[in-house]
Amino acid sequence: MEVDPMSVTRRDLLKGAAALGVAGALPQALPRVARAQTTQKRELVVAQGGDIAKFDPHFSTSSNDIRWSFNVFDNLTSRHPDGKLHPGLATEWKLQGQSQWTFKLRQGVKFHNGDPFTSADAKYSIERTYDPAAKTMVATVLTTIDRIEAPDPYTLVIQTKKPDPLLPARLGFYGGQIVPKKYLETVGGDTFNAKPVGTGPVRLTSWVKDDRAVFDANADYWGGKIDMDRLVVRSIPETAPRIAALLKGEVDIITQLPPDQAERITGNTTTRVTGALYAGLYVLGVNSKRPPLDNPLVKQALSLAIDREAIVKELWRGRGIVPNGPIAKGDNHYDASLPPLAYNPREARERLKKAGYKGEEVFLETTVAYVSQDKPMAEAVAAMWRDVGVNAKVEVIEYSVRAQKGREKTFKGMWWSDPTSTLGDPDGMMWRLLGPGGPMDYWRDARFDELGNAARFSVDEKFRGEAYREIT
């Protein structure tokens, strides 16, 4: 479902639209100590619903990780809050012919360890994302690329397999973060994940697992020093302690705020809540390789048994809409004429009967705060499944375990995900998740793959719309 996650950002303190981008509350000024004692470091403290599981930007797409990795690392392009694509580490780009893109890179940029940024780093970073040996979490994002050349230190030439008008936009989000070739090859992936080095406005200075990560401002940032000295990200998985920390002034921002708790924040004179429609969906991932979820009739029954309107009304206080498919409202080729996903428990029972379902366990794995309301939604959905005769089990797992299961594709049944529409196009969410090698690649369908591949390469928007309509 599409929801209003009650978003908050400090774009004057953190760069870009991806700085925070999730639920939270924001004090009306910096912490009192920072205002009163200007000789001390100006510190921003954020509490989120779980630890940062991965600092390596090519090995995570989860909210708890990427809102910080997009500030440690830069992309060649950057999508700003105005929705437009702006220069990042690339100052300009142009299409030559139908499938060759040339990017001019920003000069004088340094990584946090002092190494200069060059086209060699850009080439290495992008190729790493789709290298089968690397097994990254963003393997589907840049697979339209055929080859990359770096003719000089500040020019990058990318040849796509077929025309790809979305390439500059792809490079501005998941998978497009630039990592330092020399440093990563020297220290290896494990050390790089623990001690990441980027070109972004903050750099990691310490990390205590399941407690906090500390970032200091990059004084040499090419975009100018940000308006703070230090960023502290605390892990507070439970909602009540997270809210209490905010109200006591121990933190400045909290994320993953349940809608039914908003009044506690708005009722306090020093805190406030802001919201915006989330550019994505809350979806249930499915391990279709595991019985009984390998039976399409069982999956259809599970979908038909979910009363999404009730979830939006009761758990989200009306802050959301029921989607009509895997394309987010507002994206290219969103079809408003399609009805919302159906709720029909009687038909759900019929399909379970046709499937020969005999009470096998169906697991729904959830955290307590990876996405706001994930555990209450899981419990509500499981109850709806039980009502139609499904032996549904909810298992609560730690966020770090969830992240590992996502990387290794070892979910035992179903799980929550909150994919973001990264391109304003089905290719940026649906294909990224469900395409070959994507995070939800527990299934394959020849027609889906055929049409998805054809649509992502086509410049014929009429054909693209028809293709996406068929496969959704």
Regions inferred by a protein language model and the residue ranges of each:
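Periplasmic binding protein-like
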Residues: 46, 114, 253, 383-437
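N-terminal lobe/hinge region of extracytoplasmic solute-binding protein
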Residues: 47-98, 127, 195-199
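Gly/Pro-rich hinge or "lid" segments in bacterial periplasmic/extracellular proteins
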Residues: 80-84, 172-226, 230, 240, ...
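Aromatic- and charge-enriched surface segment that lines or borders ligand/interaction sites
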Residues: 91-135, 157-159, 245, 292-294
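Surface-exposed binding/hinge segments that line
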Residues: 94, 139-183
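Extracytoplasmic/peripheral linker and loop segments enriched in polar/acidic and small residues
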Residues: 102, 297, 387, 391-402, ...
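Ligand-site clamp/hinge motif
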Residues: 190, 218-264, 391
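Structural transition elements
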Residues: 321-354, 371-376
